[in-house]
């Protein structure tokens, strides 16, 4: 029987692969494009997803960790090679996230942590699914929408 952590890791890998698929469709020279001046660029969004992976792992180890926010001005891509390197970092970050999730046993997934984003104690399972995977899916939807006017 497949464990819950294995199922979550498989889902996390599928989410990441889909995100990377979208990023690879970004036309060269459009990596820093943003829909509005105050919005994160495509590259900043990719970087933000990497930060969210790192935050997830740290939050589970450091229960007092404050929520993170995506920011503009974190990344500026000068050429397509740099963007491919950012995508590679995103792939590696996703692999680390999957390995981390796979190592969580059932009791750990069901343990609770206070998460300010939700205003209450939630399970680690909830932090992974709602706080990280759903968050990435949200940004992947943005990326999909951004691709339409760029292509």
Could you describe each region identified by the protein language model?
Residues 59, 64-101:
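Helix-adjacent hinge/juxtasegments
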Residues 17, 21, 92-99, 103, ...:
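A generic structural signal for well-ordered alpha-helical segments enriched in polar/charged residues
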């Amino acid at each position: 029987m497949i464990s819950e952590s294995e199922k979550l890791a498989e889902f996390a890998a599928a989410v990441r692969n889909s995100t990377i698929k979208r990023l690879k469709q970004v036309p060269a020279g459009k990596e820093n494009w943003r829909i509005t001046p105050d919005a994160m660029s495509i590259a900043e969004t990719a970087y933000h997803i990497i930060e969210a992976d790192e935050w997830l792992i740290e939050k589970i180890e450091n229960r007092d960790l404050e929520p993170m926010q995506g920011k503009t001005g974190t990344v500026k891509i000068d050429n397509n090679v740099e963007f491919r390197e950012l995508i590679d970092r995103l792939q590696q970050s996703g692999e680390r996230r999957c390995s981390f999730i796979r190592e969580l046993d059932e009791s750990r997934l069901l343990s609770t942590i206070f998460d300010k984003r939700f205003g209450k104690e939630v399970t680690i399972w909830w932090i992974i699914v709602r706080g990280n995977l759903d968050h990435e899916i949200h940004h992947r939807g943005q990326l999909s929408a951004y691709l339409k006017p760029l292509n």
